[in-house]
């Protein structure tokens, strides 16, 4: 940190990487003049695991279990972008039923992610009650996930060409019951939090970002929409079946921490609307494009017919990526999650570049906290919503 300390009474404080309010192994080197923040330098990389390099040494099917360790609170989105990239590259068609199932899972995952943002955010501000409330609803979402995927987290459910399994009997009725119950829960959150005078004192006008600044910094997700920019990839660049549903982009114009809170609460309501429509309209048919599993090459003369039929029904380990490049993106809970994929006519990607929304959104933190009070750092950092597994990759 290049900072010439002329005043003797300035203090340099390390926040993290083990501090509970850091939401992961993030370290902040903060320069203070009393309670006023003079400078802040984030130190990243404590959770770096080389995810991009690992992708270059694995086939897509082998790599799928790794991606759930990026944003481990919204794993459906990391799975979605991982299978979308080769699907777009090879022009693989997805059955309509599989696309609807994906939308349902993605929106449930969005709600779970926003819930686990809301609880710790309120705990950072000193309110413990919402932290326990959010686990009540989040547990119900994980029960729904477990019934379909067998896992509460790290689901490994998406596949190239569809999903791993169909929805079990009676699951959609349980999902609709959850939607009705959860809408009441959102009302309870708003009554408890939104008009609370202590909460408003802590968040109103804190961490202001103008619309122009948000665009120039490359922010996305609630960080961008809370500054008056109505940019949501589900509307702007629709993927899966999002153009089949009626819902509204949530945005605010104030650009402060309160606006980011309101955007996320509003998004949970809209996610429920999307889920209800998807469950009501979901078509019949297959849940996976079996053609995507077949071998591209001709039958090996050394195999007998039984071996070929048996091997051909499994997810093919020799799914080769053609010599092309493309960028795909989805609207994750924290912003635009993208993959830049370069194929090379081989099993492994030649380049697998991840665009993590949390990493880019975090870059504006030093600007936001300067000239603020020390206690406001937790408010501003919490309003950004970062997961260090995604930031460090």
UniProtKB/Swiss-Prot annotation:
It catalyses: a plastoquinone + NADH + (n+1) H(+)(in) = a plastoquinol + NAD(+) + n H(+)(out); a plastoquinone + NADPH + (n+1) H(+)(in) = a plastoquinol + NADP(+) + n H(+)(out). Its EC number is 7.1.1.-. SUPFAM superfamilies: HydB/Nqo4-like. GO terms for biological process: photosynthesis, light reaction. Its main location: plastid. Belongs to the complex I 49 kDa subunit family. This is NAD(P)H-quinone oxidoreductase subunit H, chloroplastic. It comes from Zea mays (Maize).
């Amino acid at each position: 940190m290049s900072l010439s300390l002329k005043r003797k009474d300035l203090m340099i404080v390390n926040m993290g990487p083990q501090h509970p309010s850091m939401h992961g192994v993030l370290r902040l080197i903060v320069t203070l003049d009393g309670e006023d923040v003079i400078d802040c330098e984030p130190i990243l990389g404590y959770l770096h695991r080389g995810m991009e390099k690992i992708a270059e040494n694995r086939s897509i099917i082998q790599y799928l279990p790794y991606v759930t360790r990026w944003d481990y609170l919204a794993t459906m989105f990391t799975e979605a972008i991982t299978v979308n990239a080769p699907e777009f590259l090879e022009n693989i068609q997805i059955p309509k039923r599989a696309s609807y199932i994906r939308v349902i899972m993605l929106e449930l995952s969005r709600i779970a992610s926003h819930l686990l943002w809301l609880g710790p955010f309120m705990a950072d501000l000193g309110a413990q009650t919402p932290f326990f409330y959010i686990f009540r609803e989040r547990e119900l979402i994980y029960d729904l996930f477990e019934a379909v995927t067998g896992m509460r987290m790290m689901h490994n459910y998406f596949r190239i060409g569809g999903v791993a399994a169909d929805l079990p009997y009676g699951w959609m009725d349980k999902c609709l019951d959850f939607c009705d119950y959860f809408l009441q829960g959102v009302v309870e959150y708003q009554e408890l939090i939104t008009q609370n005078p202590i909460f408003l004192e802590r968040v109103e006008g804190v961490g202001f970002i103008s619309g122009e600044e948000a665009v120039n910094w490359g922010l996305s997700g609630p960080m961008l929409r809370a500054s008056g920019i109505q940019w949501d990839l589900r509307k702007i660049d629709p993927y899966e079946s999002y153009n089949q549903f009626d819902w509204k982009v949530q945005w605010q114009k104030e650009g402060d921490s309160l606006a980011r809170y309101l955007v996320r609460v509003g998004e949970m309501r809209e996610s429920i609307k999307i889920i209800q429509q998807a469950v009501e309209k979901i078509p019949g048919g297959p849940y996976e494009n079996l053609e995507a599993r077949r071998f591209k090459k001709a039958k090996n003369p050394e195999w007998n017919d039984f071996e070929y039929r048996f091997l051909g029904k499994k997810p093919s380990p020799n799914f080769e990526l053609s010599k092309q490049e493309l960028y795909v993106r989805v609207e994750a809970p924290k912003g635009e999650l993208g993959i830049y994929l370069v194929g090379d006519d081989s099993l492994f990607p030649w380049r697998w570049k991840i665009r993590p929304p949390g990493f880019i959104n975090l870059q504006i933190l030093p600007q936001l906290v300067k000239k603020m009070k020390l206690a406001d750092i937790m408010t501003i950092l919490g309003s950004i919503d970062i997961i260090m597994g995604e930031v460090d990759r």
